[in-house]
Regions:
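Phosphate/dinucleotide-binding and metal-coordinating scaffold of catalytic cores
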Residues: 1-443
Length: 443
């Protein structure tokens, strides 16, 4: 197999949007691949030529007649394909089915991408799933991680992270609920039957006491920051199910059920935007902001730049306050709508400083302003305001105002039942937040 068809959902229908070709399928993506929009799709979208909005596969692959290759294509594909522990599980479970003339990354792309996050899918992967009868499971079976259910979920491409075994990260699942309350892997259910699209997370690793508390804390965090006005996971339906192991149930922000159809939103990670092809790569906040600013300006969103910059800096302050050190380039995304581009809601917000693996920040400010986990927020505002051509005094005052808002977090989180282990952790400053903000010159 040297070619795959990338399908794109926009204006309430799927389109055969682009053809992906491999230089050598046996050597995989590293050997090279090219991507070109399909002429019929381009003709249908003539008035959208050069657009980076929802009609494009990526902000780095604007709609047009050019053929793309290299890092922009590879980075965009990595937003779609299973990674990390999910990939390791799939390799073990289905690797023996891989043809000898096809590399594992090409095989997974062709088999395991029927309904990834966002508005893209691989046509050939979806056709494989569509040929298999769909099976629904009760919420209780999902909560209890019924073995039969997990096997089926992986076969249908519903798992985007983790593995079923006790030795690895637990799965993250993409499931669709129908009117009868049963849950199906997203790709196996017709849009006309969909009621709710769920993103479900289980504890990491072997689901030890700390892993469970991290997940419980994540639930509390979403509840609390919503009350403070941050754009985050939808509160309706947000639930922590305990069961034998806790599971966090969240409505997906890349799906919206409307009359007789499902709206799918183009979600693109910061890694993809920066053409980063190595998972876990270190980034500089200023490089991320520079790319976002260029994108906003290219789409004539200059009037929204101040809000973008403030929100970006506010979110990093929030990460520091809540001990979320896992700030790699796939934990922040943009949504490319049909009219505008925006930051995706806050997601993957958890006290990862508690994790036994010792997770550290992978996206940082320059060493002159961030050392050993301590950030000089006044200096950050100076650098960012210069980059974005904004008044430094305004940005710094807005960040101080945010700090005043965040002083409500300790009470909010305690009322929500934040685990004591999180509350007491030495690298999470919630117990001494006023003192910490004073040290940061934010109070």
């Amino acid at each position: 197999m040297n070619h795959l068809t990338v399908q794109l959902y926009v204006e309430n229908q799927w389109h055969d949007a682009a053809q992906l070709s491999f230089t050598d399928a046996q050597q995989g993506l590293r050997a090279g691949c090219t991507l070109g929009y399909i002429p019929n799709y381009l003709v249908d979208c003539l008035d959208k030529e050069q657009s980076c909005l929802a009609w494009a596969l990526s902000a780095n692959l604007p709609l047009g007649w050019d053929t793309y290759s290299g890092a922009p294509v590879w980075a965009a594909l990595q937003d779609m394909t299973p990674a990390g522990a999910a990939r390791r599980f799939l390799e073990q479970r289905y690797g023996q089915l891989r043809p000898t003339d096809m590399a594992m990354d090409v095989f997974l792309l062709s088999q395991c991408t029927p309904a990834p996050i966002g508005h893209l899918r691989i046509k050939e992967a979806f056709e494989l799933v569509a040929s298999v009868p769909s099976i629904g499971f009760s919420r209780a079976e999902v909560v209890q991680r019924d073995h039969r259910f997990l096997e089926y979920a992986y076969e249908q491409g519903a798992a985007i992270g983790g593995a079923t075994g006790a030795g690895g990260e637990a799965p993250k699942l993409l499931l669709t609920e129908t009117a009868d309350g049963l849950l199906y892997p997203d790709a196996s259910m017709a849009d006309t039957r969909a009621v709710t699209h769920w993103f479900i997370k289980f504890p990491r690793h072997k689901a030890g006491a700390t892993d469970k508390d991290i997940l419980r804390s994540e639930y509390c965090y979403y509840r609390a920051i919503h009350q403070l006005g941050f754009s985050t996971i939808e509160q309706n339906g947000l639930m922590l199910e305990e069961g034998s192991k806790p599971s966090l149930w969240m409505r997906r922000f890349d799906r919206k059920v409307e009359s007789q159809h499902v709206r799918r939103y183009a979600v693109e990670s910061i890694y993809s935007l920066l053409k980063v092809t190595e998972p876990g790569s270190y980034l500089q906040h200023l490089d991320v902001l520079k790319r976002l600013l260029n994108l906003w300006r290219s789409e004539r969103q200059d009037a929204a730049i101040a809000d973008l910059v403030l929100e970006y800096v506010r979110r990093d302050l929030l990460n520091q306050v809540l001990g979320n050190s896992d700030n790699h380039g796939r934990n922040t995304s943009i949504i490319r709508g049909e009219h505008t581009i925006s930051l995706a809601p806050v997601y993957d917000l958890a006290p990862m400083v508690m994790d036994d693996e010792g997770i550290t920040r992978t996206t940082k400010w320059p060493q002159t302003v961030e050392r050993g986990g301590n950030v000089d927020w006044f200096a950050v505002c100076q650098l960012v305001s210069e980059l974005a051509d904004l008044p430094q005094e305004w940005l710094y005052q807005q960040l101080r105002d945010t700090a005043q808002q965040l002083l409500a977090l300790p009470d909010l989180l305690q009322d929500l039942g934040l685990p004591d282990k999180t509350w007491q952790h030495p690298r999470i400053p919630l117990r001494r937040l006023q003192q910490q903000f004073t040290a940061w010159d934010l109070c």
